[in-house]
Amino acid sequence: MKGKRVIAGILLVGIIAVTLTGCKHTDSSKKETEKSVITLGSDNYPPYNYLNEDGVPTGIDVELATEAFKRMGYQVDVVQINWEKKKELVESGEIDCIMGCFSMEGRLDDYRWAGPYIASRQVVAVNENSDIYKLSDLEGKNLAVQSTTKPEGIFLKRTDERIPKLGNLISLPHWELIYTFLGKGYVDAVAAHEESVVQYMKDYDIRFRILEEPLMVVGIGVAFAKEDDRGICEQMDRTLEEMRQDGTSLKIIEKYLDDPQKYLEVDDLGY
């Protein structure tokens, strides 16, 4: 009987061990599955990120992110976010990163960055019959920007001596509204990424005039939380550079923008 008890005990221990090992494997697999999807937060901002006719996210950043994360072994879930709360969302972990024509300029200490992967001009646009031809002509004028964007900071801080004092700076929550305000004459000018202005004119068959003198040439990057030490940001940085070098980024950008090569000239941006 004693021998039978010992054998039974050994069998019981073995069964428990196998069960626990199975549970551990299941938990591990679950964690790996959870890690395999990167949640990318972005605003609706054509041509970088927008919903196509089928309601599926598409655009320059969506295609670049999908390819980059695929090379890294991840799937990407692109979600539309409240752009004004982007920092809060990435720091809380609700999203893994921010990628939506997001300028690195003036924000280097706020996030952990991958990039720059695109160079973009911040410009001022006016109606075709406007008497505004250079930045100094904006003195006393009313100008609209999307809130929390780089142009808003440029006109609020006025650290650049070329930037005059406006009559009013109108900050609006959505990028489309700034063009509506300009088209209806509620403001004299708008400031935004040049690609956004060009895309809006194309989509709505409307003509604005872009001032030749840019506000700034900025680098576009992917932002992760400052405390994110998973190494994904650094891997993303290397992968985006590989895509720039092997021609993948050029092929993606040329689907959306004319003269795509100029947007990849990021080496002299100083980041």
Descriptions of predicted regions:
Residues M1-I10:
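Bacterial N-terminal signal peptides that target proteins for export
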Residues T19-G22:
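C-terminal motif of bacterial Sec signal peptides marking the signal peptidase cleavage site
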Residues K24, V62-R71, N129-I132, S136-K150, ...:
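Extended ligand-binding regions for polar small-molecule ligands
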Residues K30-C101, S171, Q235-M236, D246:
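Extracytoplasmic small-molecule ligand-binding "clamshell" domains
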Residues S42-N44, A119-V126, K202-R238, D259-Y271:
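Periplasmic-binding protein-like
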Residues E53, A65-Y74, P151-P173, M201-D205:
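Ligand-binding cleft/hinge of the Venus flytrap
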Residues T66, Q75-D137, R209, P214:
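Acidic, polar ligand-binding/catalytic clefts
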Residues K85-E88, C101-D110, I154-K157, F181-V217:
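A ligand-binding cleft/hinge motif common to bilobed small-molecule-binding domains
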